[in-house]
From Swiss-Prot:
Induction: By ethanol and isoniazid.
One Gene Ontology MF term: heme binding
Protein's job: A cytochrome P450 monooxygenase involved in the metabolism of fatty acids. Mechanistically, uses molecular oxygen inserting one oxygen atom into a substrate, and reducing the second into a water molecule, with two electrons provided by NADPH via cytochrome P450 reductase (NADPH--hemoprotein reductase). Catalyzes the hydroxylation of carbon-hydrogen bonds. Hydroxylates fatty acids specifically at the omega-1 position displaying the highest catalytic activity for saturated fatty acids. May be involved in the oxidative metabolism of xenobiotics.
Activity control: The omega-1 hydroxylase activity is stimulated by cytochrome b5.
Membrane topology type: Peripheral membrane protein
GO terms classed as biological process: 4-nitrophenol metabolic process; benzene metabolic process; carbon tetrachloride metabolic process; epoxygenase P450 pathway; halogenated hydrocarbon metabolic process; lipid hydroxylation; long-chain fatty acid biosynthetic process; long-chain fatty acid metabolic process
Catalytic activity: an organic molecule + reduced [NADPH--hemoprotein reductase] + O2 = an alcohol + oxidized [NADPH--hemoprotein reductase] + H2O + H(+); (5Z,8Z,11Z)-eicosatrienoate + reduced [NADPH--hemoprotein reductase] + O2 = 19-hydroxy-(5Z,8Z,11Z)-eicosatrienoate + oxidized [NADPH--hemoprotein reductase] + H2O + H(+); (5Z,8Z,11Z,14Z,17Z)-eicosapentaenoate + reduced [NADPH--hemoprotein reductase] + O2 = 19-hydroxy-(5Z,8Z,11Z,14Z,17Z)-eicosapentaenoate + oxidized [NADPH--hemoprotein reductase] + H2O + H(+); (4Z,7Z,10Z,13Z,16Z,19Z)-docosahexaenoate + reduced [NADPH--hemoprotein reductase] + O2 = 21-hydroxy-(4Z,7Z,10Z,13Z,16Z,19Z)-docosahexaenoate + oxidized [NADPH--hemoprotein reductase] + H2O + H(+)
EC number: 1.14.14.1, 1.14.13.n7
Gene designation: CYP2E1
Source organism of this protein record: Homo sapiens
InterPro entries reported for this sequence: Cyt_P450, Cyt_P450_CS, Cyt_P450_E_grp-I, Cyt_P450_E_grp-I_CYP2E-like, Cyt_P450_sf, Cytochrome_P450_fam2
Cofactor: heme
GO cellular component, as recorded: cytoplasm; endoplasmic reticulum membrane; intracellular membrane-bounded organelle; mitochondrial inner membrane
Protein name: Cytochrome P450 2E1
Amino acid sequence: MSALGVTVALLVWAAFLLLVSMWRQVHSSWNLPPGPFPLPIIGNLFQLELKNIPKSFTRLAQRFGPVFTLYVGSQRMVVMHGYKAVKEALLDYKDEFSGRGDLPAFHAHRDRGIIFNNGPTWKDIRRFSLTTLRNYGMGKQGNESRIQREAHFLLEALRKTQGQPFDPTFLIGCAPCNVIADILFRKHFDYNDEKFLRLMYLFNENFHLLSTPWLQLYNNFPSFLHYLPGSHRKVIKNVAEVKEYVSERVKEHHQSLDPNCPRDLTDCLLVEMEKEKHSAERLYTMDGITVTVADLFFAGTETTSTTLRYGLLILMKYPEIEEKLHEEIDRVIGPSRIPAIKDRQEMPYMDAVVHEIQRFITLVPSNLPHEATRDTIFRGYLIPKGTVVVPTLDSVLYDNQEFPDPEKFKPEHFLNENGKFKYSDYFKPFSTGKRVCAGEGLARMELFLLLCAILQHFNLKPLVDPKDIDLSPIHIGFGCIPPRYKLCVIPRS
């Protein structure tokens, strides 16, 4: 090697050491929770398994404790792992950690709506949206009748399969999508409607893509990856297409709005906008309402749809559990009466199975990212304002003290020694605190009523031997994505 080459190599090495030294000084300048040492530019990327980030969090928690610091690129994040740390962060520090961490794939919704909003409007918009949802029957009789009506359409669609194999992805998804569409737009779609199926495809594809390694990488290195080809472009395009559809519906509602007789949640939001028409500072705008409605449309469709689809796969894996459910349904409801929420009190096994499905699949394992809204002392550590806070829900739902053998699907996790339903404070699939899922009440009702209705009328028939059914998710990231499968539903005599 020439003298020039040696000199250049030494200069590069010296520059690298200088960067490491500067990074170490910055990293140690705060009393942060412990964590692995971050490298310049990439941070702790090598400590994360992008195909299964929750698994990486568990491994790091075993090494550094229930509260630890990571850097992904230059982004600092503090991970809360385990029931005590997660509950403390989300409830005792609900204001300090109520911000929303940045998700670049959803920048079209940034600082608007109720899910991805980290701006000054989210609290007021969320509060009004929740109040309006409750007034329209969230968790009460109004939504019960909505779901019961939709169960009728779902059962008719299932009968039309005539016992032949089908992919349940969109057929099952039609029911929760129609329920939320009725709340938002007072609209019911035919199960073969092309626009309806297109919307569900967009929701499903985005939930799938957001859970892939590339999107995990993109959401942490957007400035480097934004202009490269990749699936992030598809997600951004899909978000824009859904937003355009919702925008058209909002404009139609605005043109026919009667402020004295709101028809649905969209109308209620528009009425609030009209009240602010002459205000200098406006909380409600057409674009903001569009994003709020799009947020609710996506969340109200995909999460319940995926949970139901995963639940049917689990029940085919364990036919003895399905048989117990049939027995309980026959005893409490009978063959023809429509399932009702009041039945839940007399159906502890069904209630336990619905809870165990949600616990077992941990649909959103690492929660949506939170953000520290101010400098905060947490367990003696300083968590600076702007730090991303990750309360890991899977670490609570898979706690092996509360749920022995958490890797196994066991409805007994939610049953006492007398076979009665047993509540667990560790059951947090919807998160908790100020960012708890806005549709928790609706989702819980849908899961119980729709699963009851399906099993009241049909036996589930897998295309393979139950012991060969693989329940492992195909992707674990933003969500846990179940494998694609087909099944047959056989009418019960």
